[in-house]
Curated annotation (Swiss-Prot):
Protein name, per record: NADH-quinone oxidoreductase subunit C/D
Protein keywords: Cell inner membrane, Cell membrane, Membrane, Multifunctional enzyme, NAD, Quinone, Translocase, Transport, Ubiquinone
Catalytically driven reaction(s): a quinone + NADH + 5 H(+)(in) = a quinol + NAD(+) + 4 H(+)(out)
An MF annotation (GO) of this entry: NADH:ubiquinone reductase (non-electrogenic) activity
GO cellular component, one term: NADH dehydrogenase complex
Chain segments annotated as coiled-coil in the UniProt record: none
Job of this protein: NDH-1 shuttles electrons from NADH, via FMN and iron-sulfur (Fe-S) centers, to quinones in the respiratory chain. The immediate electron acceptor for the enzyme in this species is believed to be ubiquinone. Couples the redox reaction to proton translocation (for every two electrons transferred, four hydrogen ions are translocated across the cytoplasmic membrane), and thus conserves the redox energy in a proton gradient.
Start and end residues of each stretch annotated as NADH dehydrogenase I subunit C: 1-189
Subcellular location: Cell inner membrane
Membrane topology designation: Peripheral membrane protein
Keyword Membrane: yes
Organism of provenance: Edwardsiella ictaluri (strain 93-146)
């Protein structure tokens, strides 16, 4: 880490702030003048700057060229502003598009916003500055109907090509009951099948050269090595991959749209299913972002409990990843060993939360209930068991010469490429950048734990899988500290917006009982504002960007997932490799399609 973010961390997480003291605001004013843009106070923890459409490319290029540049486009998406009532001080807009940039050198973020009128939904593409903007712009076009001029291939991404309408617009229905009954006729079926045909010319690909013809191969969407409903079309010259086109969206469920029709509390179970292996890790950024809106500071016991559950799920996910990677390379046995170890984790999770994969256990202001008797014994037994088992995975499989031969030097990329494609997690740390949100931007008390951030230097498949092994060791260190230093105290915050409030108080205070009734029946009312929270999830950085319009439901829920960025990177990495290398590369990414498609 370079420039400290101590100032930001000392501020109350829920304090509305315009961040005018951030150095980048001064740099922008010096370059473009004080009247060139407006700054929006939010609870996102970063400067939010509205710029004119005509200045967008120039401003983004300027941020990339600063002495400590903003080198990563972390996120890009839109918002339908037409029904938003709390817009005081903001530029007039029917729609808006935001660009979230990260500077690794500064350890700081900035968000740029552009206001758009409904009759003129056009923006210049930023793909020439940030190549990973490609999918984000396609998705924004798909879900909002905003056109990005100059985009190399502006087509739908998550929805089928035959889809009518743009689902994240406010005038688009949110429930199936608002649509006419669906009927799949033979004609519709033929139309859908025709739309799935791959035409190389649409993607700028040649069918052949003067000397040879290329073969086009569909890998997926139901191939065992594609790790879910994921299709990737390969342009092949024999076994060599000339180019490829990833095709996503088969697992899309409209998770962000669902956030607009669920209360702040009732949306928690949906967060578990964004990345279905991460469990409570997925709940963390959502509840932290909501707590920023509400102004809730949770007790120390809650922070440590949340960290404990998150690290258990991190180990659980990493074990599945390591074993399936080994399986993709050709060894079967480790998968069965891993499921034995994962069962021990599920026993702890079930004892604590009552559920296994999808606990939906974190609450706004705390957790659902206190730790049960005997939780410490279960955790202690696991901590005694797991280190030796982890050593056996390394010795028996990961040090195997065949596995090394299939993965060392395969699908390698450097730090510059990783940042350009928005790569996070082990994929970024394998290139030598030790960016881990738990260390660089601690949340939920991670600053009180001692652990290391493992890194590597080759950026290949083998580095990525070995980093996950080391991350498990660090998670075990964190769990040891949770076991030894679990604070006493309540498991929920004493705050009016804690949902649901502590039950014992509802039996003693009529005000709390009324509050409980309103929160359960209608949902808590959050102050109008915007908040943001990123966490180090199992597969990289996961974040929630929430917009409240002062109601019981989110006005806009934006979910940024790591797997989405990692799959977009595939063509740039795998060109010139063999098909067999692609299988190993896919296994090394660590993704699930629910995390990609949401």
């Amino acid at each position: 880490m370079t420039d400290s973010t101590t100032h930001d961390r000392e501020m109350s997480a829920w304090q509305t702030h315009d961040h005018l003291d951030d150095p980048v605001i001064g740099e922008l004013r010096n370059r473009f003048g004080p009247e060139a843009f407006s700054v929006q106070p939010t609870r996102t923890g970063m400067p939010v700057v509205w710029v004119k459409r005509e200045q967008l490319l120039e401003v983004m290029a300027f941020l990339r060229q600063l002495p400590k540049p903003y080198v990563m486009l972390f996120d890009l998406h839109g918002m339908d502003e037409r029904l938003r009532t709390h817009r005081q001080g903001l530029p007039a807009a029917d729609f808006s598009v935001f660009y979230h940039l990260i500077s690794i050198d500064r350890n700081r973020d900035i968000m740029l916003k552009v206001a758009l009128a409904e009759q003129d939904l056009h923006l210049p593409t930023v793909t020439r500055l940030f190549p990973n903007a490609n999918w984000y712009e396609r998705e924004t076009f798909d879900l909002f109907g905003i056109t990005f001029d100059g985009h190399p291939h502006l087509t739908r991404l998550l929805m089928p090509r035959t889809w009518q309408g743009h689902p994240l617009r406010k005038d688009y229905p949110a429930r199936a009951t608002e649509f006419d009954p669906f009927e799949l006729t033979r004609q519709k079926q033929d139309l859908e099948m025709e739309s799935l045909k791959f035409r190389p010319e649409e993607w700028g690909m040649q069918r052949g050269t003067a000397n040879e013809d290329f073969m086009f191969l569909n890998l997926g969407p139901n191939h065992p090595s594609s790790h879910g409903a994921f299709r990737i079309v390969l342009q092949l010259d024999g076994e060599d991959i000339v180019d490829c086109v990833p095709d996503i969206g088969y697992h899309h469920r409209g998770a962000e749209k669902m956030g607009e029709r669920q209360s702040w509390h009732s949306y928690i179970p949906y967060t578990d299913r964004i990345e279905y292996l991460g469990g409570c890790v997925n709940e963390m950024p959502y509840v932290l972002a909501v707590e920023k809106l509400a102004g809730i500071e949770v007790p120390e016991r809650v922070k440590v409990i949340r960290v404990m559950l998150s690290e258990l799920f991190r180990i659980n996910s990493h074990l599945l990843y390591i074993s399936t990677f080994i399986q993709d390379v050709g060894a079967m046995t480790p998968v069965f060993f891993a499921f034995t170890d994962r069962q021990k984790i599920y026993d702890i999770v079930e004892a604590v939360t009552g559920f296994r994969m999808h606990p939906a256990w974190f609450r706004i202001g705390g957790v659902a209930h206190d730790l049960p008797k005997g939780w410490d014994r279960l955790l202690r037994e696991f901590l005694e068991w797991m280190p030796k088992r982890l050593d056996s995975y390394v010795k028996a499989a990961l040090h195997n010469s065949i596995l090394k031969g299939r993965s060392i030097g395969v699908a390698a990329y450097g730090a510059k490429d990783a940042l350009a494609w928005g790569t996070t997690g082990a994929g970024l740390r394998a290139t030598g950048i030790a960016f881990d949100v738990r260390k660089w931007r601690p949340y939920s008390g991670y600053e009180n734990f001692e652990f290391e951030v493992p890194t590597a230097s080759n950026g290949d498949c083998y580095d990525r899988v070995m980093l996950k092994v080391e991350e498990i060791r660090q998670s075990l260190r964190i769990l040891q500290q949770c076991l030894k230093n679990m604070p006493e105290g309540p498991f929920k915050a004493d705050h009016p917006l804690t949902t649901p409030p502590p039950k014992e108080r509802t039996l003693q205070h009529i005000d709390t009982l009324i509050n409980h009734f309103l929160q359960v029946s209608w949902g808590p009312v959050m102050p109008a504002n915007e908040s943001f929270q990123m966490v180090e999830a199992t597969k990289g950085i996961n974040s929630y960007y929430l917009t409240s319009d002062g109601g019981t439901m989110s006005y806009r829920t934006r979910i940024r997932t790591p797997s989405y960025a990692h799959l977009q990177q595939i063509p740039s990495v795998i060109r010139g490799c063999l098909v067999s290398d692609l299988i190993v590369y896919l296994g090394s990414i660590d993704f699930v399609m629910s995390d990609v498609d949401r």
